[in-house]
Amino acid sequence: MNKLKNFFKIGFYFANIILITLYLFPGSIFGCFLYDNCYIQPQITKDLFVGDFIISANHVYAFILLTSLGVLSFHNTKKINFLIVYLFLLSIILELFHIIIIDRGFELSDLFGNIVGVILVILIYKIVIRYVKT
């Protein structure tokens, strides 16, 4: 079990580095490689519409992955509450950095996507630890 948990921790730290790099890069790294155009952002799926709100699907997926790796790494430890705060702050701060990064722009749909990705995994985690005995 420790080897699996260590595997998830390495994945979590690696995913943090990748996500922060992708967020702080002026333009789109994926667009540079896939389309030979750093101004085009590839879409995995269409954005999500909830009432009048648009939620960036790419951002939801990225933060679901990051939060899942974090929860798998730190569940049943004292660090889980710190992890939750860290992920919420990271999701907000990274999007706020887009205000000052060249060729990037702050978008509420991206911010909502980040936060929704974190909330979904945390809700599932809280339900599982409450109703499923491990």
What function would you assign to each model-found segment?
Residues M1-L111, I115, I119-T134:
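Bulky hydrophobic segments
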